[in-house]
């Protein structure tokens, strides 16, 4: 699945970062629905693009500060399948900030191809996830504090 426009985030509301995606044949399983692991790939892309909007290039963070983000916990619920050619929006909210980690809420919604709004505004998301992302020191693999400048960027976004 490719983003409809990877450089154009589509925020839904204050505090929500979102990107559009379309389901391609390569994203589906033999039953014609999105293969479960593909939702995780799309969520990772949204986290990466969200960090970019905060001024974080993960390669620079690793090279210059020796830090990297790792998923340390994941709780996911598959509510309803997405299918070939569906237009989706994957969003992200920051639910909790701790010294060395973030808990992010991520959801996948079916959206209208005409307006990119949800097909059914009252519907539950197709997929709901809670993702704990920890900051890790690349040299020793131990947890590291979230950099102050990153906390400031999150607060002002």
Where does each model-flagged region fall?
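HotDog/MaoC-like acyl-thioester-processing domains
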Residues: 2-11, 19, 78-87, 95-157
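Hot-dog-fold acyl-thioester-processing enzymes
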Residues: 2-71, 137-157
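Short coil/loop residues immediately preceding or within conserved phosphate-binding loops
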Residues: 71-73, 103
């Amino acid at each position: 699945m490719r983003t409809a426009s990877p450089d154009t985030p589509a925020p839904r509301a204050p505090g929500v970062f979102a990107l559009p995606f379309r389901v391609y044949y390569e994203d589906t399983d033999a039953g014609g629905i999105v293969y479960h692991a593909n939702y995780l790939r799309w969520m990772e892309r949204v986290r990466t693009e969200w960090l970019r909007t905060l001024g974080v290039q993960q390669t620079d963070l690793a090279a210059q500060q020796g830090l990297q983000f790792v998923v340390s916990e994941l709780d996911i619920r598959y509510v309803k399948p997405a299918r070939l050619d569906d237009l989706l929006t994957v969003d992200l909210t920051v639910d909790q900030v701790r010294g060395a980690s973030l808990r992010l809420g991520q959801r996948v919604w079916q959206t209208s191809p005409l307006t990119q709004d949800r097909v059914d505004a009252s519907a539950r998301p197709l997929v709901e996830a809670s993702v704990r992302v920890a900051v890790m020191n690349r040299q020793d693999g131990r947890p590291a504090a979230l950099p102050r400048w990153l906390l400031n960027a999150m607060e002002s976004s």
